[in-house]
Amino acid sequence: MCGDSTVEANVRELLGDRQAVLIHADPPYGMGKEKDGVMNDNLYREKLDEFQMKWIKACRGNVENNGSFYIWGNAEDLWRLWYCGGLKDSERLTFRNQIIWDKKSGQGMLSEDFRMFAPATEHCLFYMLGEQGFNNNADNYWDGWDSVLSYLQGEAKKVGLNPSLLKEICGVGNFSHWFTKSQWVFIPEHHYSKLQEYFGRDGFKKEYDGFKKEYDGLKKEYDGLKKEFYATRAYFNNTHESMTDVWEYPRVQGEERWNHATPKPVDMISRIYKSSSPDDGIIYSPFLGSGTDIIAAQKIEGDRTVYGMELSLEYIEIILQRWQKFANIPAKRIN
């Protein structure tokens, strides 16, 4: 669709009531290339952050609550957006990676006037909506453990057990894990027995087998809740190829650039799709550019649908030309 991705009404017109599971965005980098046809590229620092937050908020109503975002940009701008630009605190988000695209064609600069190392990479911020990690930190402590933990805490207080004494008795420094809500885990039998032996009749009088049975009953309920939680997590599949957060793809050159300022390799975008969207997933591209996102979906197995927004009429023509050349079928205007 030819429209403005920072306008919620335009996004709603494109997507309707559909919910995207993946947002792949290659927005303006703030490199001052408006004269070269890159709209909104003369925005810098806080103005660029405002622009980024505007398009993110505009599409949020059409994104699944466990969706994933991939946003390309300069490293400094992406980190400022995350920490200072309002993104990190906009809702509950889970940072995943700063993906580095190694373009394999960097060339050093032998110049006294060049005050930095020559860049040969581009960067992508990858995050997921919602709480994605099921951990047992104090903030995520499950209240169902209270009956077990309260007994342990009560016995420890009664006999004066502290971290240093525990280490003396058991040889490990696990006081916070066994007797507080911070990363709480159930105490192993051999350590519990050492406490019973050390304190005798003064504390830890419950027999371990019965105590463990009580814990196992609670754990069954906990595991059920954990399973339900995992079912709500963002889609992610890293089994289709071996990957790290450094992606090695040659830079796009020649006619394959399609007159775009920061073109991405089709196969690299396909990797994102395979990793963060199911075969029938809906993907939204708020800056469609030369249409790479559409081609990337067509090159892989599955029935993914890409909905793209592009502000420039010039690029709309390029997208249509490129699609028709790739698919060998005429594009159809719907509205």
Model-found features: residue ranges?
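Conserved phosphoryl-transfer catalytic core
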Residues: Q324-N335
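Core catalytic lobe of class I
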Residues: M1-I316
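Short alpha-helix adjacent to the SAM-binding motif of class I
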Residues: E314-K325
